């Protein structure tokens, strides 16, 4: 072999080595941006379903014509993890290749077999009971997935990666310290070899931030502070004579969205700190209560839109941003929408942050002691909730009709507080519709004067917000993304606090605080199916296909702020034929038990022993199910008819349950 041939061979070997190395590097980036950008089908790979946060499934096997045949395949308990007064179950399950990954309010992670519901592995976080910088209950909204790892953000500020097959720890870092006010409640986002997360803590003198880490080893790649420091763009919206920016809030509650084509990442931010006293933080207080766009690879600022200037009402923006592509006046546009605590949708061009549907600055009432902003942004169209009060609650007088943006000082001022909180919205891009899950409340605001400089980790609200003793109601609204007007809207008897998932089968799935999972017709909001689980359904559903069949799964674990019964169950549903329906009767008893506990026990007692105005339920096994179901359906003696309240399948489930109560005591009517 001559020197030329040796040199040529050496060069080829070097090139081959480089190509092999690059191929190995790129093969590690999975799922890739193309997969994560597609509407989910066989898997559900990220919180929100895709990088656009659409919470939309392209599957159609389950649709408006057959959803009434939906039934439980299995239910699994998660070893009692996250059951307790301080916990909430808000996590959306992730699904990959026949395995489901779910995290509880205790930050314990479970891998479940789709086929059987069997627990394949469990990771226990063993959180310290000393964690005290938690705003709104111990919770997690999900895990991230990528490169054969499950990414977990914990309340103690730890971010870690677990092996997807075994649950073994791959790496762990102390991303932030809970003692300084920082916790992680959102699902981490995997994108192009990065794990990206925000941090909660605006009520604890925190300075908001988003960080990106290497998915391979957890090393820090970039940081963006949502409250700018000296010499950074936006710092001039904070006072020059103090260090209010250091404890300025603006934390990020939710999983961001990404547009890979533009190379931008998007999120919205929390309230400034302190929440209710603006006297020490004059200025607009960027980038709090804002939508922010960054370069996804570097974390560099690209644009922002502030929804509330100098927020003193806790009108921040915890609802996840959603991306969509839609024609406006015949021109294709890249859109972004966010449902604010103000009760408005903010619909923007995600390339530059300019409104796609008009937003104008309007003068608002002033309170000099609060250093209030002279104007606030008012989107055109309609709000998805009411923004004023028509009657003053007992013990209060109305100022400015209780309208949003009414300022306050020491004397409590009652205002409308209709909002979209963390429960995610969903977008049907084909229809050009965004569905929003919200609540309507009213609260009296007041400040606490003589603020002392807070240290990170101190409770730092600067006042208070007291809710009126009036029931909180839920609002579910379908909003036209082109006009920002309501297509339909409905009021629920309690707060909408689960998040939403829509499908190409014209369905909208929503959980309820009383334990129901419901399927609505997305076109008009009519209820088509519901199932009573054993605890509050306060997490968005996940929809996927496995072995050619469509499934719906939901975490039924309850919620602190939703005042929902706690639990530890994951439920899996699919379309059942008659034979499978018979097999599911055991699960129907679980549904019947839930219905009984939420409706019947108040009169008949928890175990059917009798109670207020209700006779004992004894020995009903002596009668067949159809007889008992007829009584429930039509009513008897002082018991009202439930035909209009419960579906036929629910009545059957309830009948099956009450027949199991006190079976050894003869029924007086069976003698």
What kind of region is each of these model predictions?
Residues 29-31, 578-595, 668-671:
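Electrostatic cytochrome c docking/interface patches
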Residues 593, 602-638, 642-645:
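Gly/Gly-Pro-rich "capping" loops immediately C-terminal to redox-active cysteine motifs
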Residues 183-216, 310-372, 384, 404, ...:
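Repeat-solenoid scaffold signature
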Residues 209-219, 284-298, 474-480, 568-576:
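Beta-propeller blade signature
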